[in-house]
Swiss-Prot record:
Originating organism: Mus musculus (Mouse)
Gene3D superfamilies named in the record: Nucleoside Triphosphate Pyrophosphohydrolase
Positions of short motif Nudix box: 70-91
Alphabetic keyword roster: Hydrolase, Magnesium, Manganese, Metal-binding, Mitochondrion
Location of this chain's protein in the cell: Mitochondrion
Protein name as it appears in the record: Mitochondrial coenzyme A diphosphatase NUDT8
Amino acid sequence: MLPDGLSAEDEQRCRQLLARTTARLRSRPAAAAVLVPLCLVRGVPALLYTLRSSRLVGRHKGEVSFPGGKCDPDDQDVIHTALRETQEELGLEVPKEHVWGVLQPVYDREKATIVPVLANVGPLDLQSLRPNLEEVDEVFEMSLAHLLQTQNQGYTHFCQGGHFSYTLPVFLHGPHRVWGLTAVITELTLKLLAPGFYQPSLAVPELPRG
């Protein structure tokens, strides 16, 4: 039987596992932070995603992402950044006590640090959200059960200069394909929530050394 990922036991276990990373990273400088929203949609445990507006400037427009953005000098820490950006993008207020902790950071092509913040936002009616249409085209969920099914998992191989460079996870057969760093963060989350059920064959890439 698949775990629901949102039980009191799951929360306690995840908070304990994330405590050290949270203490180490929450106040460390970072380029950006994103919220990884655990939620219940029609009673089903899920992760909440956004489709970035096609009107945005830059290479990430129209991509699937978690709510989040650049750290502001006035932000107290990366948790504050993630919660502020979620409110600005979705009109969703997430109390700080609903945050379970900080996940392992990921890095973009420019080696900028992006810190994922895991929180349980509870039961959610997507129709009640007020997305900022300048930043978000769509809000959708993918259930944990869907994400944990092997037929919905894959990998994308990237090449640079005609040579194999790196491989990242991809999650398929939902409203939109989840790939790139959003898929990496999804993989980190599934490894934490369901270690006995999600066992990827690919290690999450780390910041290149040197």
